[in-house]
Amino acid sequence: MKNRVNPFNPFCYIIIALTLVLCLSSCKTKSFKQEQAELQKVSVTLDWTPNTNHTGIYVAKELGYFQEQGLEVDILQPGQNVTDQIVATGKSEFGVSYQENVIRARSENIPLVSIAAVIQHNTSGFASLKKAGIKSPLDFEGKRYGSWDSPSELAILRATMEKYGADFNKVTVISGIYDFFSTIGKDADFEWIYYGWDGVEAERRGIALNYIPLKEIDPVFDYYTPVIISSEDYLAKNPQTSKKFMTALKKGYEYCIAKPDSAADILLKNVPELNPEQVKRSMQYLAKEYKSDALVWGIQNPVVWKRFCEWMYQQRLIQLAVDPDKAYSNEFLPQ
């Protein structure tokens, strides 16, 4: 009688199982490599060293939101270059900048476009040590102002003082001030800070401040800072890629709003040199500010663009008037 293969022989099942595992593994490896090869590479250049303004970008990359949209995104720092120039010349597809920079660039025929407001309202203002007794812009007279040497910065300071009937010429401007905590009360009596970073850090250190928010001085100063930018040329030629980028980025910032502690951990994982306590506090503050009273994260109000464009022109911060409707766009945000 001929030998028959027992169809219930366990060794047959082992061989079949191993064959299936190897086939599936091979398919998965091929699929992963194919997926990686198909990802479109783009970059986003930050405006400054990494901080909590940028957390949504790191979250979108870390949690695979960019990859879900078919994008491989490099997060770059500007180094000695200016982000606006990097984006305008096509060396980076996207960047982080400020509303006043976009307006100034467009007045010089550099067609940058803001495609999202990272924070819905201006969270910056003038800060001083409480013991300095600076409670209103009237108290700026006779004091030293620590400046980072921005033309719009000094124009806003001057306009603020004039509105309150104070004399800007009675302020001593100290140039080259960039580190609030090492200079306030020593080299300068008051400085311009972003509350979501330096303000919450002062709270953590137990440093009592007097703080005058810009948006409470005049509605025109409630402009967008920072913003996500691209160039007109790139947006026109790559509308779908731009929409994919913004879809992932919006999801990243929505995560920051919903889970600020987890988002802080992601930023710290990618930028371990940051102070964990400062990042955690900053994220708790910004989670309420990223979207604030807007319906969706990133949306830009035409009124904000119109009034600040007009103000910059009136103050002669730009030589040519800028069409505000061309300086920003909401069309790349997911509906």
Protein language model features and the residues they cover:
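Bacterial lipoprotein signal-peptidase II cleavage site
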Residues: 27-35
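Bacterial N-terminal signal peptides that target proteins for export
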Residues: 2-14
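Secondary-structure end/capping motifs
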Residues: 236-314
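Pocket-lining segment of extracytoplasmic ligand-binding domains
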Residues: 100, 179-271
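Short, glycine-/small- and polar/acidic-enriched structural segments
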Residues: 35-177, 182-185, 189-193, 222
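C-terminal motif of bacterial Sec signal peptides marking the signal peptidase cleavage site
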Residues: 22-26
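Periplasmic-binding protein-like
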Residues: 118-128, 208-235, 246, 285-289, ...
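Conserved C-terminal helix/tail region of periplasmic/extracytoplasmic solute-binding proteins
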Residues: 305-335
